[in-house]
Amino acid sequence: MKADHTQVTRLLKTARGQIDGILKMVEEDRYCLEVSSQIMAAQSILKKANRMVLKAHM
């Protein structure tokens, strides 16, 4: 079974966009809980992409 490259790529690009947004939030000295919330969202997307890749490996 191969990972759906399109879906994994989309997830990774979404995470990259979120991380870019997080960097901007940090530079703007935004409220720490807002930053933390966005970090957790990015982690969730990365975990999902990782699960897809690992599932395809099995």
Summary of predicted features, one role per range:
Residues M1-M58:
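Solvent-exposed interaction patches of small proteins and small membrane subunits
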